């Protein structure tokens, strides 16, 4: 069984046979509309976010499997905040303020893809992403909030 795998980012629920999907899967000879419909069905909950999609096609039978990853942490943070982008000058310009609870929510969504062994450290990873995006956490620089988490200031959030 010869198979080929394509990995691509598509907008949740809005995949089309056009670029970038069409040119990537067209040469595989699989039914493009079936692929598009299945991707849209599986990514509908991630509307407006870029979602990693992995398409594995059997070159002999033209069957395919689609697996959906979770959107990048940045996309989940932006979606949670309801904004379109982070700061253009992180460190000097603040784009928004994020709460530890929101960071925890994103950490739960991304947990399997993160390096952390527990939700507390996963939340700190998400907060690190916020720092690079110019997003404050709890009204201050995310690095300070990470120290507060280490000091146990937000332990009640992680026991929910």
From Swiss-Prot:
This is Large ribosomal subunit protein uL11. Forms part of the ribosomal stalk which helps the ribosome interact with GTP-bound translation factors. The keyword Ribosomal protein applies. GO terms for cellular component: large ribosomal subunit. One of its GO terms (biological process) is translation. NCBIfam families: PRK01143.1. Residues 141-160 are annotated as: Disordered. Part of the ribosomal stalk of the 50S ribosomal subunit. Interacts with L10 and the large rRNA to form the base of the stalk. L10 forms an elongated spine to which L12 dimers bind in a sequential fashion forming a multimeric L10(L12)X complex. InterPro entries: Ribosomal_uL11, Ribosomal_uL11_C, Ribosomal_uL11_C_sf, Ribosomal_uL11_CS, Ribosomal_uL11_N, Ribosomal_uL11_N_sf. The keyword RNA-binding applies. GO terms for molecular function: large ribosomal subunit rRNA binding; structural constituent of ribosome. The gene is rpl11. Residues 151-160 have a biased composition (Acidic residues). Residues 141-150 have a biased composition (Basic and acidic residues). Belongs to the universal ribosomal protein uL11 family. Keywords: Ribonucleoprotein, Ribosomal protein, RNA-binding, rRNA-binding.
